[in-house]
Structures are given as C-alpha cells and as structure tokens.
C-alpha cells in the first residue's frame, strides 16, 4: 500500500488538472464597459455574450443562476409558457419520392422556459432607481441545438460595486467583468470617448458634431391598454412599409432599446425622438436583426426545407404562424410573439425562421430581442495630458500615470505597463514598473512623450543612505546628505572638499607617508638595477680593451671565452693538465669534457665576484633615495600649505564642474547678460530647425564706430504648425466576411428570402434546377428542381477610425523680431519671408513626409497620432482595400466583393459554395501590416469642417531658415530704448540641481513702452539656468521661467539682461519622494543669447553664494565641520608631535 500511494496521488492530481481544463472550456467572458466617472441618473449599462451550442433536449431545464453581489430582478426568472413549434419530414413518404411543399410537416406543443428575455412593464425603467439588475437570455436554434445569448442590464452604479462575478446557464459559466474605460462619461468608439447627443443634429450645424455608428440592443415589452391603438406596435411597422388593410394584428407592446454599452432607455416607437424612428425603420427592413449569426459561423451552410405553417398555441384549430423551415447553422432568434393576438402568445421555433415581413398581414411574429446599428450624432470628450511620476523601488522604479479625464494610450520602451488601474473621481490612474534606472525613463501617455530623469531618483536614494549613516547626529544628517549627494563631477568635488576641510590634517600626512614609502622602494630598486647594469658594462669594456691590446680571450684548450685576464691565465695553467680552472678538480684535457664540466661547476663566477669586491660598493643613501628618506612630511608647515592649496584647487573644481555640457538645443548655462556683435558687416544666420523646436536669438548690435551705441535685437521663431485643408471622407468600418450556402430541394431561388438579403453589403449567385444526381443529397431526391443559393455578405460592422484626405498643405512658423523699440510679427509660410527695413527672415524650404492627396487615418483621439496612406480608394473600392467600407453622412458605402462562386458537389452530399475572392477586410489587412505605413504625431490639434492644424514632434520634419540683419542700422535712433523693465521674484517650486528643475514665478513691470519682446532668465548671483521669451505689455506681467541647475545655496532671481530682482528664492533639495516627468516637447527649445560662459570671477561668486547658503540654511552643519577640523588637527598634533629645537638639544 505504501508503494502504491504515490501512484494514487499522481492520478488524483492528473484528474484535478483535467477537471480544471474541462471547466476552463466552459468559461465565457461577458464584458461590461463602464465610464470611469459615474453620477446619478446616468442610465443603464448593458452587455451580452454568445455561449456554445446547447442540445435542444436541455433547453427546457435551463436556468440562469447568479453568484454576483448585485440584486437580480426576479421577473425574468419565472417560468413562461411557450409554444414549441418544430418541423420534420413526413414519415409516410415513399422511397425516392421527389421533395415538394407537402413533404414536411410541423408540430406544436406547449413547454415552460425560464430566464428568457420577457421583460415586464416598468422593470427596465425602474432598474436604475431600484438598483436592480436584469439578466436574461435568448435562443437561436436549429433542429438539434440552440445558441444561447445572455444579456445583462443593470444600473450604471453597479460599475462601482462590482468588479467581477459569475453567472451560470446550464453547464456554462459566465465570467462577468466590469471594465472601466478611460472615458469620463462617454462610450469607447473608434478608440475615442463618444457622448451620443441626439439633439445636436437638430440644433447645431453639421461641422460641430460627429456621427458615429453604434450598436443598439432592443427588448420587447408587453404593455396592454384597454382602449385605443396607441400600443399596437405592428400598426407602426405596417404604416412604415405602407401596408394597408391589416386589421387582425392586435398585439400591444413596445421595444425598449439600449444604445452602445451604456445609455438611458430608448422607447420604440416614440413620435418625438428621431432615434426611435431610425430604429423602427431598421427593424422594418431587417425584422430579425442586423446581426445575422455569430462570428464562428461566418462560413457555414443551411438547408431550407421550405415555407411551413403551424399552430400557436397548439390548441388552435387553424394555422396562426408561418415561417421558413431549415436545418444547419442557426441564424436569428428563435423566440417571438404573435402579432395577431391581443394576449401575448410566445413561440419558440427551433429550426424555423418565423415570418417577420411586415408587408404581409397574417401569421407574423415579432422577435423578443433585436440587435442592430444606428448612426448617432454627438461629441468626443476632450483629453488632457498625463502626469507621470516615479519612486525608487529596489533595483528599479515604481511609476504611476494619471490623467484628469482618462488615459487612452500609454506605452514605454523601458517599462512594463501592466494596466493596473485605479479611478479617483474623474481621474484615471495606471501603475507600472520600470526595471532599469541606469537610463532615463521614457513614457508615451495620451500622445505626449514624458521623460523621468532617473538620476534624481538615485539622488534621493543617496540622500536616504547618507542620512542613515549620519543618523547619530540627526540635526545635520539630512542637510549634510543633501550637500554630498550631487550627481557627476560636481558631487565628487563636494565630497573631496568636505573630506579635505574636515580630515585634511590627518589624511595629508598619512597619504604622504604611504606615497613616500612607495617612492623610496621604487628609487632603491631603480638604483640597484642601475648598479648591476653599470658593472656589466664595465666588464664588457675591460674585455674589449684587453682584446685590443693582448689578443683573443678564448682558451686554446677548452675553447671557452674568458672575461678577465686572471680568468684566462687560470685557464691556460689548468686546462692543459686536465684540471678545472675554477674548482681545480681533475678532468680530461679535451674541449668537450671541460665544457661539460663547466655547466655543472658552481664556481664559474669566481673571477667576476673577485672583480666586484675590488670595486667601490654602492651607497644607497645618496641622491634621490636619501632625499625621500629624510623628507619631513609631518611638518606643520608642509601639511598646512598642502591643506590650503588643496582647498583652493577643489573649490575651483567644484565651481567649474557645476556647468553643464554645451548642447545643440535646449538650455546652456551662461552668465548674465547677452552677447555683443559689432556690425562691421551684415549679420547672417543660416540653419535647419526641427519642426518641434522653437528658436530664440538675442544679441546687442554694436556700432563699430561708436562702441557706446548698442541696439537690442531679439528674434523669436515658434514651432512649426502644419495647416492642412482636408476633406472628411467619413468613418472607416471593419466587418466580418460571411459565406453562406442555402440549399433547398424544390422551387426556384426567388421563392425564399435569404439572410444576406437584409445585409448592407452582399452578393448572391443562384445555381438553380440541377439536371444531374451529383448535386443532391440522398434525403432530397429529384432532378431538374431545387436551388443552391450562394451568398457573400458583410455584417458586424464596427467603426474603427476617422479618415481625412489632404487637399492642400501649408507649413508655417510665427516669427517675431524686436529691434530697438520696433516690434514686428508675421506668420511665415514655406518660401516666404518677414521683411523689414533692416531684417529679413525667410523660410527657404521644408522637408516633410506629407503630400497633398495623402489620406490621414486616426484610430483614436487626434492626440494619439495617425497613419499616412498614399493610396486610398474613394470611388471604386474592392473589399480588402484601404477605405473599402466607409460610413459617410450620405450613408454606407459598400465595397465590390470581387470574386467568383463555385459550387462544390459530391454524390449524395449537400452542395457547398466556395468563393475565390478576398475574404479579409481592409482594416484587418492594415493591422497585419501596420508597421509598413508612415505614422505621424499630433500635438495641439485644431480641427474644423475643412481644416486641420497640428504640431508634429517628429524631428525628421525640418525647416531651412535664413536670417539677415543689415549693417546699415540707424544706431542713433534705435540705440536709445526708453523701455524700462523692473523685476520681482514672486514664488518658486521644484528643486535645484540638474534633475527635474524648478519653476520661477516672476512679476515683470514694463514702463515707457506699450510692448516689448524680450527674454526673462532665472539666475542666481553667478550664472543663469533657464529662460523664457515673452512679449511684455505695459504694466504688470506674470512670467513663469523653468530652469535646471544651481546648488543648495542658490537664491534664484528673475533677470533681464544684467538687471535682476532685488531678492531671490531658494528651491527645494532634489530628493523628492516622487519624481515627476516633464514633457519632451517643452524642452525642444533652442536658446542663443551669446551670453559669456562662467569664468573665474563667476566661479568665486558661486563659491561665496554656496558658503553663505550653507551658513543660512543649517549653521549646525558648519559647526560640526569645524569641530571635525579641530579634531583632525588635535589628532595630527598627537600623532606627529613637534620636533625639539636643535639649539635646545645642543646647548654649549
């Protein structure tokens, strides 16, 4: 038993996994789309889902169950009597009898069904007020199975109380998911938030609203009145189709419809609401609905048995209902109510399409549910930009994006967007994780590029770390950490400066001692190496000299080359008698024997050693080695001198390292003032400017003959604006392609109405009266009769985007110049100029990806950007082309369904239709090849009936600009500028440093002039960190200046040229818990005022401001630093005591 238990456990686990797999197949999702701002009295939210087929034998036992936390209305849960009307082949037909209208028969019986969409009066109307939800289902059946469609309607307030729950129908489970979209109160259509407002079409011109096609779901409600024909709904249909003479249709009731995913109830018919009239007309044209089948049955077949009649209820003596009997894929609803009876008679007809043609008088039915589409006017909700901020979390960052109206688009190349949403009032919030902080975090949100500077996050973590290290002295821990945690070389310079100041008297002698020890060892090694080298050189010289005077140094016996004369003399004496000249041991007097002995002899260097001993020994205590050994690194004079020099050097490095690198665009830190240009010749500027960038150029133009005469010159070029004259082509639609085979045994093809004939776009081909047996199934014998009808149609139309065609294009920039007191502005087109008596500014050309006749497709809000189509069909469109299905104000434009039908036959098999044309819609093709289309960005769009203006942030769009300022200026007149500018710093927020930056609020007063174009800078005493160009008007002006830079002691002031406000304000430290991203578009500014760079005097100003800032900020930091300095001097004195005086030690 013990051995078999693991096997049993394994089998049990496998069984559980298989059970979960089976359950997963029975789980269906019902999505309820809700706006994220929900108030009182905003109607109902509705959703539906189609379930897998259920055997017809189980239908009578179906019951809709709920585990949801909302209150379900019980009116639809009760049993209701239905007449089950079915058909079958007669059993008494002889074999091989040719099929005819008499070959089939129908049967009627009474059954009880529960949970169908039989909604009593006032249930939907009071659902919102009573906080009750309605759940029901409808059936589409053939002879063997039924396709349930479950509907859920509830007060829109359930979006706040429910996130998900389960419904059950038979063995199927329905996961109800309430999904709150980014729409404030509208519905999500075409990726935009659309608010249907049906009265706009009656009261406003057509260019002020949009028209969008939206799904509508309608439910039949029975309401019987005692007198009059006001509730006889069939009368309205007959009047609409101009049918007269029908008097027997006394059913009373109305349809209650819900538009889109959420709306107020719409009553059909209603005389004073054109929406009701539109739905009524569509019901008359497509009595079974405009959605013909489920998407899984897009390619399917059905066999039509023919027209049949029957009894409803089954106790009737004559037939009261008629329809078309079929088998195969179910199409429309199989439930309805007779129009002829005053009291409702409900019919369930599996395998029969009940009569719904309102142009006949008798035996008609109305469906219990109807689904279609309706074009509605309305307005698109305005979108707002996102705010994105991040906090450091582990190795990455936790980020959050929120918008006041909703987030329709968010993506990031460096972060994982997990779509975890929160809603706070009208705001939508999305949290996500960024795994890397070694690079700046880029987030695209609501069409705007946001950049979060991660070094600011790292600074915050650094401050937290140092604050923890210095937590023993909490009074200064945070202030000291703020000074230490500065990014880049500037931060390291700060650390070295503080270390030198506090611990220099200990570190300087310690580090000097270590360096001296290393240098002494190196000097000794070098000197020793040099001694050995000199000795070898000396030996070589002696040997060469001996060879010149005495001859060869080679022994004649052993052939060994000697190095000294004594060694050669020993060889001559010993080798001839067979003795070793070194160790004097006996050996053979042959060269080979003696040389072999020399290899093992240990005294071969005896003569060289004797020579070395005879020379003078090396004295390592001379020269460099002795100087290093006797260096007095513990001298107070040396330590103090080095300490002072290091402090001065590090202060200079600290001040110089605060400058940022020069950039081609963006702000470059400069000193106060602006550049001066002597006008010895014309001033000419020629450059290329990206479409997303603005350009500011400011100089003082100096008279070369009189340096005191200067004219202020300011040039401002704004961002490029694209002006397109457009033609609104309408809304591009997506659709499901359907291919249907309808086969019946007898009669002509015109005898029956096929489902595609009520579709908006369809093609049909009939194969009539077959002459052979090869195309007839065995249960449909006969030759020369019957029909195979092939149909292709489009349904489930869905609006996917707006389409505009470019008629003409203009690229403009607003150019303003201020020369002295004269100001001129003009919106300049391409190949156009702004010309004054002294200045000429021209846009020579534009590089662009747009061309007239291009088509622009927007798949969402304009701010999301769009796609450029070079080829877009407008007249003859084929299915699958861009623009194949278009919804226009004049109606639906259907494409040509090009292709040919072929009927596939096999003996004793029902024929099947085939279509060799394209079966994929143009939209689906576009999605599959979306990357092959050019995209474009849209910022600050403005749209009207025939014009669209926007700014494209793509740097590939550029303007070639040429500026010429003539040297022939009237310096005497223009140099005298009476304009007086006074500045006051009002407020500041943000942080100093090169992180997120700060915002300085300036109050600027202009006198003596009516208007003055100039730039206001954000500076401290030494240099400036940001600027904005503004057109001042007489009086008080509030200006916001954004800057980046500075240090803890910076008091930011508002400055104009060299004049600044009298007081400055200190920004916060760059260690915010949440670092907010900035718009990349806001930083695409090129500013050039020619101001001088920060020099030596600027550095020392910055130093003084920093020191004063530290003293004013937290004087305890300075006190602690001085205490540490005194401590280090004491330790120095203790470890390095002063040497006694020489005179004191050597008194006579």
Curated annotation (Swiss-Prot):
Presence of keyword Methyltransferase: no
Gene3D superfamilies: 1.10.8.1320
Result for mutant: residue 25 to R: In strain: isolate Sotkamo 2009/WHO Arbovirus collection
GO molecular function annotations of the record: RNA binding; zinc ion binding
Impact when changing residue 953 to P: In strain: isolate Sotkamo 2009/WHO Arbovirus collection
One GO cellular component term: membrane
Site entry (Cleavage), positions: 658-659
Cytoplasmic topological domain: 518-637, 1137-1148
Motif (YxxL): 625-628
Residues covered by region (Fusion loop): 767-787
Listed GO biological process terms: fusion of virus membrane with host endosome membrane; signal transduction; symbiont entry into host cell; symbiont-mediated suppression of host innate immune response; symbiont-mediated suppression of host TRAF-mediated signal transduction; virion attachment to host cell
Disulfide bonds: 34-159, 68-165, 117-136, 141-146, 183-193, 218-257, 386-445, 390-399, 415-434, 462-485, 745-780, 749-787, 761-894, 775-905, 790-913, 816-825, 833-842, 873-877, 979-1009, 1002-1054, 1019-1024, 1055-1060, 1094-1098
Zinc-finger ranges (CCHC-type): 555-575, 580-601
Annotated ranges, domain ITAM: 621-644
Residues carrying a glycan: 142, 357, 409, 937
Signal peptide (UniProt feature, chain positions): 1-23
Keywords of the record: Disulfide bond, Fusion of virus membrane with host endosomal membrane, Fusion of virus membrane with host membrane, Glycoprotein, Host endoplasmic reticulum, Host Golgi apparatus, Host membrane, Host mitochondrion, Host-virus interaction, Inhibition of host innate immune response by virus, Inhibition of host RLR pathway by virus, Inhibition of host TRAFs by virus, Membrane, Metal-binding, Phosphoprotein, Repeat, Signal, Transmembrane, Transmembrane helix, Viral attachment to host cell, Viral immunoevasion, Viral penetration into host cytoplasm, Virion, Virus entry into host cell, Zinc, Zinc-finger
Binding to the ribonucleoprotein: annotated segments: 526-543, 598-615, 621-635, 1131-1148
Membrane topology (Lumenal): 24-496, 659-1115
Effect of residue 988 to I: In strain: isolate Sotkamo 2009/WHO Arbovirus collection
Transmembrane segments: 497-517, 638-658, 1116-1136
Family (UniProt): Belongs to the hantavirus envelope glycoprotein family.
Protein name: Envelopment polyprotein
Species assigned in the record: Puumala virus (strain Sotkamo/V-2969/81)
